[in-house]
């Protein structure tokens, strides 16, 4: 049987950026890697209901900068920025260095593989029929401009005695084309029958400029907790 390489891993440095960008010498590398793992584990647990897509980590000059990409920034920031301040203190304590937290909004959650996979998994846990959940996700993605999408679920589907896999695809998903912008992610649905795995591939088009084009597109400033405006008038 032909096996598939991880679509994100093979595209790192070609059209996909790294989730952790820092340099460390031999002594500090293991500590930094362990710190990144613990920070991500903590934030994913705390923000389980905040539709978090991915968490990027930078380490400039004995500090840590965490960017949380989420479809619901209001939940992460909290009332007057209280929640994000608690997260900042907790991350600083875990990493052992001063922390800064930025929030980046995911404008189209229907085109984000992680959020789509989480959505399908939560529907399966609520006993929605798996075919209906898959088709709904595919239709929403194609409606919002995806060039192609593939969804696969595997496990005891519908409470069947024998586990199996089913998939549904629409459009193109060219896994062999390295310049193709393919977003891939997974999720798990914990049902009464057992665990059902969900995999999502979303093809958004081809990136012709390589990493330079990717970096340019990601230069939009991350959202910060906003203060209430003083005046009511508009310019």
Curated annotation (Swiss-Prot):
<keyword id="KW-0689">Ribosomal protein</keyword>
<keyword id="KW-0694">RNA-binding</keyword>
<dbReference type="InterPro" id="IPR004044">
    <property type="entry name" value="KH_dom_type_2"/>
</dbReference>
<comment type="similarity">
    <text>Belongs to the universal ribosomal protein uS3 family.</text>
</comment>
<keyword id="KW-0687">Ribonucleoprotein</keyword>
<dbReference type="InterPro" id="IPR015946">
    <property type="entry name" value="KH_dom-like_a/b"/>
</dbReference>
<keyword id="KW-0699">rRNA-binding</keyword>
<dbReference type="InterPro" id="IPR018280">
    <property type="entry name" value="Ribosomal_uS3_CS"/>
</dbReference>
<dbReference type="InterPro" id="IPR036419">
    <property type="entry name" value="Ribosomal_S3_C_sf"/>
</dbReference>
<dbReference type="GO" id="GO:0022627">
    <property type="term" value="C:cytosolic small ribosomal subunit"/>
</dbReference>
<dbReference type="GO" id="GO:0006412">
    <property type="term" value="P:translation"/>
</dbReference>
<comment type="subunit">
    <text>Part of the 30S ribosomal subunit. Forms a tight complex with proteins S10 and S14.</text>
</comment>
<comment type="function">
    <text>Binds the lower part of the 30S subunit head. Binds mRNA in the 70S ribosome, positioning it for translation.</text>
</comment>
<dbReference type="InterPro" id="IPR009019">
    <property type="entry name" value="KH_sf_prok-type"/>
</dbReference>
<feature type="domain" description="KH type-2">
    <location>
        <begin position="39"/>
        <end position="107"/>
    </location>
</feature>
<dbReference type="GO" id="GO:0019843">
    <property type="term" value="F:rRNA binding"/>
</dbReference>
<dbReference type="GO" id="GO:0003729">
    <property type="term" value="F:mRNA binding"/>
</dbReference>
<dbReference type="Pfam" id="PF07650">
    <property type="entry name" value="KH_2"/>
</dbReference>
<protein>
    <recommendedName>
        <fullName>Small ribosomal subunit protein uS3</fullName>
    </recommendedName>
</protein>
<dbReference type="Pfam" id="PF00189">
    <property type="entry name" value="Ribosomal_S3_C"/>
</dbReference>
<dbReference type="InterPro" id="IPR005704">
    <property type="entry name" value="Ribosomal_uS3_bac-typ"/>
</dbReference>
<dbReference type="InterPro" id="IPR004087">
    <property type="entry name" value="KH_dom"/>
</dbReference>
<dbReference type="InterPro" id="IPR001351">
    <property type="entry name" value="Ribosomal_uS3_C"/>
</dbReference>
<dbReference type="GO" id="GO:0003735">
    <property type="term" value="F:structural constituent of ribosome"/>
</dbReference>
């Amino acid at each position: 049987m032909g096996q598939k390489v991880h679509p994100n891993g093979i595209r790192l440095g070609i059209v996909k950026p790294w989730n952790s960008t820092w340099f460390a010498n031999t002594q500090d590398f293991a500590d930094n890697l362990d710190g990144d793992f613990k920070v991500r584990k903590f934030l994913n647990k705390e923000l389980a209901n905040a539709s978090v897509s991915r968490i990027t980590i930078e380490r400039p000059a004995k500090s840590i900068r965490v960017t949380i990409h989420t479809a619901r920034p209001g939940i992460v920031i909290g009332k007057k920025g209280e929640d994000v301040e608690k997260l900042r203190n907790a991350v600083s304590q875990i990493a052992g260095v001063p922390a800064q937290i930025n929030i980046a909004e995911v404008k189209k959650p229907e085109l984000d593989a992680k959020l789509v996979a989480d959505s399908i998994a939560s529907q399966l846990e609520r006993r929605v029929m798996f075919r209906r959940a898959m088709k709904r996700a595919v239709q929403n993605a194609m409606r919002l401009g995806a060039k192609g999408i593939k969804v696969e679920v595997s496990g005891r589907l519908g409470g069947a005695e024998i586990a199996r896999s089913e998939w549904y695809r629409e459009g193109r998903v060219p896994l062999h084309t390295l310049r193709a912008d393919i977003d891939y992610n997974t999720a798990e649905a914990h049902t009464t029958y057992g665990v059902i795995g969900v995999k999502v591939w979303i093809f958004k088009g081809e990136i012709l400029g390589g990493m330079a084009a990717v970096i340019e597109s990601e230069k939009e400033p991350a959202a910060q907790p906003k203060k209430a405006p003083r005046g009511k008038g508009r310019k």
